[in-house]
A protein has these predicted regions:
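Short alpha-helical segments that sit at the start of domains
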Residues: 1-19, 108
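A composition-driven surface/loop motif
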Residues: 9-14, 35-37, 44, 78, ...
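Short, locally clustered residues in the helix-turn-helix/winged-helix DNA-binding domain
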Residues: 17-24, 78
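Short acidic, hydrophobic short linear motifs in intrinsically disordered regions
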Residues: 24-38
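Short amphipathic alpha-helical interaction segments
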Residues: 35-52, 61
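Minor-groove-contacting beta-hairpin "wing" of winged helix-turn-helix DNA-binding domains
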Residues: 62-68
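Short, amphipathic alpha-helical interaction segments positioned at domain boundaries
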Residues: 68-103
Length: 114
């Protein structure tokens, strides 16, 4: 596996963790922004998903929710999403979502540093 795909797979894993957390309302806003020790990559993933309009921030708990585009994205990749949630075919699932996320265009500009 080449290094760039390996890095994309790592980022993809964090993106999927963020998508899962958004659905389960299980994290604080600090976790999403990477303010929790050792979770800087989660902040990068949160920004990547926001820039693709798959999640949006909101006031109050939960700090993020799926957008209609995010819901459609997960529905379009339902089989792979279910495989991710059940931890089956982990590598194949991550490759699937790495390619799917790369094909999803960014619609928001980079946010200024917080």
């Amino acid at each position: 596996m080449d290094q760039s795909l390996e890095m994309d797979i790592g980022k993809t894993l964090h993106c999927l963790e963020v998508l899962h957390a958004v659905q389960t309302d299980s994290r604080t806003s600090g976790w999403y922004w990477g303010d929790v020790r050792g979770k800087a990559a989660v902040g990068v993933a949160t920004t990547a998903l926001w820039r693709r309009d798959l999640i949006c921030s909101r006031v109050g708990p939960p700090p993020f929710r799926l957008t209609p585009k995010g819901e459609a994205f997960l529905k379009a990749h339902k089989k792979a999403w279910e495989a991710f949630l059940t931890n089956t075919d982990r590598h194949e699932t991550l490759e699937h979502f790495a390619h799917a996320l790369q094909k999803t265009p960014e619609v928001h500009e980079v946010r200024a540093a917080r």
